[in-house]
Amino acid sequence: MPQLNPNPWFYIMLMSWLTFSLIIQPELLSFTLTNPLSNKTSTTTRSSPWTWPWT
């Protein structure tokens, strides 16, 4: 059962995670957000219950 041999698969997994962690992730984190964060408190909207015609 060659799929149980971790030699090639472990290397591929390790290289892909290193590529993601060292190259792709810092580039993604450097982007600015399109909507800046605000300190406003979120308002909760109250909804009235639906009046069902058959009750």
Curated annotation (Swiss-Prot):
Membrane topology reported for the UniProt record: Single-pass membrane protein
Transmembrane portions of the chain: 7-29
GO cellular component terms, semicolon-separated: mitochondrial membrane; proton-transporting ATP synthase complex
InterPro entries xrefs: ATP8_metazoa, ATPase_protein_8
Keywords on record: ATP synthesis, CF(0), Hydrogen ion transport, Ion transport, Membrane, Mitochondrion, Transmembrane, Transmembrane helix, Transport
GO term, biological process aspect, one: proton motive force-driven ATP synthesis
N-terminal signal peptide: none
UniProt-annotated location(s): Mitochondrion membrane
SS bond partners: none
GO molecular function, one term: proton transmembrane transporter activity
Family: Belongs to the ATPase protein 8 family.
Protein function: Subunit 8, of the mitochondrial membrane ATP synthase complex (F(1)F(0) ATP synthase or Complex V) that produces ATP from ADP in the presence of a proton gradient across the membrane which is generated by electron transport complexes of the respiratory chain. ATP synthase complex consist of a soluble F(1) head domain - the catalytic core - and a membrane F(1) domain - the membrane proton channel. These two domains are linked by a central stalk rotating inside the F(1) region and a stationary peripheral stalk.
Protein's UniProt name: ATP synthase F(0) complex subunit 8
Organism this protein belongs to: Musophaga violacea (Violet turaco)
Lineage, top ranks: Eukaryota, Metazoa, Chordata, Craniata, Vertebrata
Gene name per UniProt: MT-ATP8
